[in-house]
Amino acid sequence: MNTSILAILFLIQCVFTLGLHFHPLDPLTPQEINKTSFIVKKSHLGNLKDLTFHYLDLEEPNKSHVLQWLSPNPSKKPPPPRRRSFVVVRAGGQTYELIIDLTTSKIASSRIYTGHGFPSFTFIELFKASKLPLTYPPFKKSILDRSLNISEVSCIPFTVGWYGETTTRRELKASCFYRDGSVNVFTRPIEGITVTIDVDSMQVIKYSDRFRKPIPDKEGNDFRTKHRPFPFFCNVSDTGFKILGNRVKWANWKFHVGFTARAGVTISTASVLDPRTKRFRRVMYRGHVSETFVPYMDPTYEWYYRTFMDIGEFGFGRSAVNLQPLIDCPQNAAFLDGHVAGPDGTAQKMTNVMCVFEKNGYGASFRHTEINVPGQVITSGEAEISLVVRMVATLGNYDYIVDWEFKKNGAIRVGVDLTGVLEVKATSYTSNDQITENVYGTLVAKNTIAVNHDHYLTYYLDLDVDGNGNSLVKAKLKTVRVTEVNKTSSRRKSYWTVVKETAKTEADGRVRLGSDPVELLIVNPNKKTKIGNTVGYRLIPEHLQATSLLTDDDYPELRAGYTKYPVWVTAYDRSERWAGGFYSDRSRGDDGLAVWSSRNREIENKDIVMWYNVGFHHIPYQEDFPVMPTLHGGFTLRPSNFFDNDPLIG
């Protein structure tokens, strides 16, 4: 198609879109994705060998421009930010970064990336790598020597991390499994074989077959339920919410929901209605899962490298699954699609990857019974109804159910449920009584050891509490002895009081939880309630969060230093969104949250970002096999002196 005709068609599409609930942070449309790839392919890169698209997303517009455009004052509203896309492609063994101006149909910038690390793998690369061992003669011989049928073998490629190599290439290591009629592939490993693959050349570059172990029995490992599933009801007859484009309105909330190949669901420009002023007030500019880290605790040759950073290496959104009505989401849910770029740059539709629904919490959002009014018993309350935005990502053996839940009291509850199947290794042991060595896990079935591991989900939370100028306040609870002065009127010997400390720099913004009682608040020191309290939101963890137990000099820890603290607060920078660095695969720890925080920038009364790690140390148990019941984690962002009184009362 002629470039000028394409530009005209795109302009028409943009004008149409702007008239239908446009938002500057809307994900790229299929037309914008295809236009981007068309421009890249028509450039000098189109002539290079094996041009492959690894990242194609909206180039984040300037935050101040977005906020001005969203201003309710028409006289201050500038033109919408220009739509631009950011692209990462591989061609001829090199990584290229481009910014495409979708209005002018021109490349605004282009450079070759020469730093450490590589972009995420495409599903085509992963598929080819999974099939490669099956055609490799030494592997075929190993399977034959084990008297196995190669048609029943499945291989799964894993990322390899970084372990001090001075030069690296794009590699995967494939582990293989023997189905033999079983659908629970991960429970039947063919132990002892490791296949190392050069992804760019798609060739086996190293092969080892070190030992053999009996393959675990397939009997009893089926994860499919034998019970008829109960329908998923919420007892909320009406939807109660409106979705206008990517904008969602419900009760006293309005926000923008998006979907990207890397982060999956994103929540932006979330504002809550003040019942006194009848105006919406800002709470969060941007929120999404930034990175995951799943290191396994087996240092042996076949396992040591399994330290996955799934979002940067594979993509949370790209791994999102089609949500199943009445299983993943209730009958009153609205389902939303996402669009991502395929390896060839063309738009791919991902159907029903998000759902939005009202949830009945089967409890009270508030209640009270008063018996001290003469002759009366007065009871009042309100049922807990909230709004949930949900997605599910399946990354290999694990499924992550991610919820953003908005409450009428002004709180945002962020939850993640871990489920799926364990990653196991084969063993000759059939009883725990036989084990006399460190097996780095738990015997969960005969010949089956589930390996110890961690899960960390790092959330990016660009909170704008009533504006951009925010601070981190640590409200520390301190025990105080009753003084001699008070002893004349009190029999008490002690009490606790609150001592508030405001973090000055990013070093102060690195916080460990659990040792001393403290509440963490993001406040706006420039805004106060009618009676003079500083407005804010506080962080409420749902359980004691795990932090990394790896030593600082261990290579996985160098790459994932952001897991050393559950809470980080940094100065806002538009380019700092991915906790493990943008190029996670084979990264060396020279980019990412820990590096940014080490700059020790000022964070008092600044535009700041909170990062929160939902962390688990997972010691496997037999009840986790053959499929793991959901394990919940999360946190709540709750208004704290943000309103003049309880917003549920008004």
Curated annotation (Swiss-Prot):
Record bears the keyword Acetylation: no
Signal sequence, renumbered to the chain: 1-19
Pfam families recorded: Cu_amine_oxid, Cu_amine_oxidN2, Cu_amine_oxidN3
Record keywords, A-Z: Apoptosis, Copper, Disulfide bond, Glycoprotein, Jasmonic acid signaling pathway, Manganese, Metal-binding, Oxidoreductase, Secreted, Signal, TPQ
Ligand binding (Cu cation): H453, H455, H618
Tissue: Expressed in the vascular tissues at the division/differentiation transition zone.
InterPro entries for the chain: Cu_Am_ox_TPQ-bd, Cu_amine_oxidase, Cu_amine_oxidase_C, Cu_amine_oxidase_C_sf, Cu_amine_oxidase_N-reg, Cu_amine_oxidase_N2, Cu_amine_oxidase_N3
Gene Ontology terms for molecular function: copper ion binding; primary methylamine oxidase activity; quinone binding
Cofactor annotation comment: Contains 1 topaquinone per subunit. Binds 1 copper ion per subunit. Can also use zinc ion as cofactor.
Phenotypic consequence of gene deletion: Impaired sensitivity to jasmonic acid (MeJA).
Subunit record text: Homodimer.
Primary role: Oxidizes preferentially the aliphatic diamine putrescine with production of the corresponding aldehyde, ammonia and hydrogen peroxide. May be involved in the regulation of developmental programmed cell death (PCD) in both vascular tissue and the root cap. Required for jasmonic acid-(MeJA) mediated early protoxylem differentiation associated with putrescine levels reduction and H(2)O(2) accumulation in roots.
Name the record gives this protein: Primary amine oxidase 1
